[in-house]
């Protein structure tokens, strides 16, 4: 029963977040939407930011579980952009709220996972030093995160995605060059 209530609270919050800004959602709105009392809400969550944090972390973890391997840069970007597009209004409401730091931290964690998984999948047999791998992950993670943030801060426009596809075409082969440069340095 407790897990059902907790899931109902999360579902109501996400529904409301897709309807109005985070700052306009109250505990009262959530409990009225899912038909519980305030005490039930506070039994499960300290406040709305803790509810938001748990939802964002769970959704990030779920995305990570869904992609045990990633075989192209296009797939890297697709993972980062797919869920945001599905929940565009909610993402914009979180991004434009005072609680966006936790959202950005989990987005950065997702970007790091995606890049690390891509490198492991595509370059599993390439010999790249631990230091170089760390630097490459840092570089590519920040690149992915930066493009994602730019897209969200510009309103998540659909037409921006075609520019992103073109950027990926222009950058095709860059990860391979980075690994090749790492191997040349080691010689």
Sequence positions of predicted segments:
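Alpha-helical bundle regulatory/interaction domains
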Residues: 1-20, 24-27, 33-187
């Amino acid at each position: 029963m407790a897990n059902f209530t907790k899931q109902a609270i999360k579902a109501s919050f996400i529904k409301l977040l897709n309807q109005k800004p985070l700052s306009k959602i109250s505990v009262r709105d959530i409990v009225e939407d899912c038909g519980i009392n305030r005490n039930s809400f506070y039994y499960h969550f300290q406040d709305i930011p803790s509810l938001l944090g748990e939802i964002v972390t769970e959704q990030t973890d779920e995305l990570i579980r869904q992609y045990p391997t990633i075989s192209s840069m296009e797939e890297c970007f697709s993972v980062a952009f797919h869920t945001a597009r599905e929940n565009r209004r909610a993402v914009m409401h979180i991004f434009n709220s005072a609680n966006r730091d936790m959202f950005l931290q989990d987005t950065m964690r997702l970007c790091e996972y995606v890049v690390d998984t891509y490198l492991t999948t595509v370059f599993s047999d390439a010999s790249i030093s631990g230091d170089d791998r760390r630097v490459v992950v840092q570089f590519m993670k920040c690149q992915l995160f930066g493009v994602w943030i730019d897209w969200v801060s510009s309103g998540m426009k659909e037409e921006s995605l075609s520019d992103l596809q073109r950027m990926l075409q222009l950058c095709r082969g860059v990860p391979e060059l980075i690994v090749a440069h790492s191997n040349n340095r080691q010689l």
